Amino acid sequence: MPVPALPRLGLGCAPLANLYRAITEEEAEATVAAAFDAGRPVTYLDTAPHYGLGRSEERLGRALAGRDRASYVLSTKVGRRLRDLEPGETPDGQGFTDVPDRARVWDFTADGIRATLEGSLTRLGVDAVDIVYLHDVEDHLPEVYATGFPALAELRDQGMVKAIGFGMNHSDVLARLVADLDVDVVLCAGRWTLLERTAYDDLLPVCERRGTKVVVGGVYNSGLLADPRPGAHYDYAAAPQELLDRALDMAAVCGEFGVPLRAAALRYPFAHPSVVSALVGAASAAEVRDNTAMFDHDIPDAMWHALVERGLLDPDVPLPLAASLAAGE
């Protein structure tokens, strides 16, 4: 089946599961409502069992209750199956706070893939999802090739999901999987950004050749491109001074054209024609509105050329110029 039409901006729903800080049920529901009510409706929503040990899916399901299922695109992930804790066990939040009494189990068997998806459907309160990604499989490739992907492909063939693929931040592994398998779409985090071109060199060429769609995440590289300052994070760790300086220089150039660095970071991945959507997380309605405002911010072509001229973008990479973006809408 073809990949469902995706809006350019999607909502990453990990923050709904108390990622790094707790939010209330009301805040989670308001976040999702704001996505639908935005001037540019954010109607692609991505979640996973991993996010808060099922809490993201549960909260998203409650927030979507009563909405027309045809009005949004929904993706989740498989590879980590959830189970109830045994007596004496404690949950491992892995960055999520106030999590349910569950544990994650890597499971790429056919039965495990199906059970994981069925659990997600129950938590989400829906009969089907549109896209299913195999999640963070870089250390499990033999199992993926032997059973995980074939099981997911069977679900696609049976019409239980519309599109299948992989989601991770290792673009080289994604490139190999796209080359080897019948992959509809990939979710690549943090590897095609203002600061990181790895995916441009390894993943995007094979996706363009194979007709595989690309959803990008991590456009701010863990925060450095959202707020470049001492102590900012890059790929989940403190940003090296060299990258901090480069981000600050980029922010200065963008500022000369009246453009926030966040707006440039969110727009940039669409320079490549294989990129169809960008997922950005939000933990409040205000953050959703800010994301949409950043995405719709006017960016003159001259700003992109200035970044190249000052050595802040490589001269061989494509630029998200207005004419090319308009053609892709």
Where are these regions (language model features)?
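N-terminal binding-site loop/beta-alpha segment at the start of enzyme catalytic domains
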Residues: M1-Y72, R80-D84
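Structural preference for beta-strand elements that scaffold enzyme active sites
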Residues: L6-G10, V42-Y44, S71-S75, A128-Y133, ...
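Conserved, mostly hydrophobic/aromatic
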Residues: L11, A28, L45, L60, ...
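Short, acidic/polar
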Residues: A22-D37, T109-R123, N169-R176
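Acidic (Asp/Glu)-rich catalytic clusters
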Residues: A63-R69, T122-G125, L177-L181
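Short, flexible, mixed-charge acidic loops at enzyme active sites
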Residues: L85-F96, R229-A232
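Active-site groove signature of glycoside hydrolases
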Residues: L121-H140
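Beta/alpha (TIM)-barrel catalytic core signal, keyed to glycine-rich beta->alpha loops juxtaposed to Asp/Glu
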Residues: V137-E329
